[in-house]
Amino acid sequence: YTPPALQDIEREWAVGRPNPLRWWDEVLFPRGTGPFIRRARESASYERELVAGQWGLIPWFAKEPKLKYPTNNARSEELADKASYKHPWARGQRCIIPASDFDEPNWETGRNVWWRFKRVDGALWSLAGLWNTWTDKATGEVHESYTMLTINADTHPLMKRMHKPDPKAPADAQDKRSVIPIEAGDVDTWLAGTVEEASTL
């Protein structure tokens, strides 16, 4: 996916810059460095905070930041149970992942053709995510990281056409996945609401 320009993030989400320079990748791939917005950790009241971290959540039990399995996406229906995500989910460590666009693979021609998704109104995407802070016990280095949440899209008229079909699964049970856009009016609830409130978005 493509992160927005820094000034667009500041304007869209009313969050100030902690650093005068852009410090994330121009185009994001798993394990790259990208921006995310969370509830400010050091503020007594509610504020938004812009952070850069690895796209691929580093769980508390990791031995090193580079994992042997992917954590760039997390199934929303499994957050409360999966070891990698259940603690950030229970603690309310939700974030917004800003995106100008994102790409999904379409296999209707028999080969992968990337489709790019942008909002028709020209606005930026606010994608649902979880974040975690992990400290390397050997070096003391602090790593910020995040994962992008997904939802089943088998009944969505467009998103069900994305991703390679599973030949072993019936046509109506492919478990096609989609990212989860959060509307502007729901951003604060997603960042600071209860788990129950966030689950309804």
Please state what every model-predicted region is.
Residues Y1-L201:
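Short linear sequence motif anchored by a di-proline
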